[in-house]
């Protein structure tokens, strides 16, 4: 079950994330659920597989903002690294970072 404690156990900074949601746990958890289902993950993967660094950057950058605002640090870190790599138009190493992201995303989704 997706709970504040379960998120914290996976490394999310729930105190910070909750603070951004005025300590409204139900609202925060609803936003986290929405973030876990965001279509940006699929857009990012499709763009990387197609070698489209610009589209991949746009998807990664959008995810970075969402995940950062919710303080979902284990997801934010690989997305942030991907964003900076793609900002420079580079794709080397991006599939490895995507693999890390997908692995962590699976852990978070398994909480539901």
Say what each PLM segment does.
Residues 1-112:
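Two-component system phosphorelay core
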């Amino acid at each position: 079950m997706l709970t504040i404690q379960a998120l914290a156990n996976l490394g999310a900074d729930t105190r910070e994330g909750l603070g951004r949601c005025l300590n409204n746990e139900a609202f925060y958890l609803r936003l986290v659920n929405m973030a876990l289902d965001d279509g940006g993950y699929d857009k990012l993967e499709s763009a990387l597989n197609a070698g489209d660094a610009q589209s991949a950057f746009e998807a990664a950058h959008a995810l970075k903002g969402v995940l950062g605002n919710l303080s979902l640090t284990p997801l934010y870190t690989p997305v942030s690294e991907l964003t900076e790599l793609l900002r420079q138009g580079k794709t080397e190493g991006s599939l490895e970072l995507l693999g890390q992201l997908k692995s962590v995303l699976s852990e978070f989704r398994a909480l539901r």
